[in-house]
C-alpha cells in the first residue's frame, strides 16, 4: 500500500479520460466514475453554459428552463467569466457542433 493517492490532481484525471477516449472507452469510464446525480449535474452545467453563451435568456429564465437554482446559474456564469473570449467562442462552437452531430446521427 502506498502512502499517497495515485491520482492527485485534475491533469492526471484528464489524462486518464483522454487515454480512455483514444480507446473509444470514455463513455464507460465516465459512467463508472460518476453517479447518476453527478452525470445529471454535468448535463445541467453543459446546458447552463450553452444558454449563457447564447445570451438570449436571463439567469432567472435559464434557471426556470433547466429546473436548477439561480445560484447554480451564477456559479456557471462566474466560471465562464474566468475564460477568454477565444475560449468561449471555441466552447460555443463545440456545443453547437456536438448538438448538430447528435441530430445528424439520430436522422440516420
Curated annotation (Swiss-Prot):
Keyword Transcription: yes
Gene Ontology CC entries for this record: cytoplasm
Signal peptide span: none
Entry keywords, A to Z: Cytoplasm, DNA-binding, Repressor, Transcription, Transcription regulation
Segments of the chain annotated as binding DNA: 59-82
Location relative to the cell: Cytoplasm
Main location: cytoplasm
GO molecular function: DNA-binding transcription factor activity; sequence-specific DNA binding
Gene3D superfamilies: TrpR-like (1.10.1270.10)
Pfam families per record: Trp_repressor
Gene Ontology process terms (BP): negative regulation of DNA-templated transcription
InterPro entries, alphabetized: Trp_repress, Trp_repress_bac, Trp_repressor/repl_initiator, TrpR-like_sf
Listed NCBIfam families: TrpR (TIGR01321)
Function comment: This protein is an aporepressor. When complexed with L-tryptophan it binds the operator region of the trp operon and prevents the initiation of transcription.
Family: Belongs to the TrpR family.
HAMAP family assigned to the protein according to its UniProt record, in alphabetical order: Trp_repressor
Subunit structure: Homodimer.
The protein's name in its UniProt record: Trp operon repressor homolog
UniProt source species: Aliivibrio fischeri (strain MJ11)
Protein's gene: trpR
